[in-house]
Amino acid sequence: MPSAFSVSSFPVSIPAVLTQTDWTEPWLMGLATFHALCVLLTCLSSRSYRLQIGHFLCLVILVYCAEYINEAAAMNWRLFSKYQYFDSRGMFISIVFSAPLLVNAMIIVVMWVWKTLNVMTDLKNAQERRKEKKRRRKED
């Protein structure tokens, strides 16, 4: 069982944070479920551009608000947690909240780049076909 955290003795390394966190706490399981649903939405939204843009913007806004969420959680941690995980440096919230959201956002950006490359390839192929058609008409 992990020891109780205090803000002054909060671990500074990622492995220490991950190993000293009590992952059985209901709010952390809820957060893990939230991240799983975000990944699912990222995968399912690949065919709906508007949904994907909205999802991406929500992810970025949540990451932007992480500092404020950390401050609120640091003041009210007794209401939902056994331990004080929320330090002033924001290490914990960065690892368990922001990092997965940023990974999701990066996946969306990679999907956009992939789609853009495919469209550019299709466009170039269409241009080549049109060019070839014109060349054949001139020969006839």
UniProtKB/Swiss-Prot annotation:
Query: How does this protein sit in the membrane?
Result: Multi-pass membrane protein
Record Pfam families:
TMEM18
Give the signal sequence positions: none
Q: What is its main location?
A: cytoplasm
Perinuclear space compartment ranges equal 1-25, 74-91
Q: What's any GO biological process attached to this entry?
A: cell migration
Tell me one GO molecular function of this protein: DNA binding
Q: Where is this region: DNA-binding?
A: 113-140
Spans within the Nuclear topological domain: 47-52, 113-140
What this chain does, per the record?
Answer: Transcription repressor. Sequence-specific ssDNA and dsDNA binding protein, with preference for GCT end CTG repeats. Cell migration modulator which enhances the glioma-specific migration ability of neural stem cells (NSC) and neural precursor cells (NPC).
Q: How does it assemble?
A: Forms homooligomers, independently of the DNA-binding domain.
- Return the protein name: Transmembrane protein 18
Q: Which organism is it from?
A: Homo sapiens (Human)
Q: Which gene encodes it?
A: TMEM18
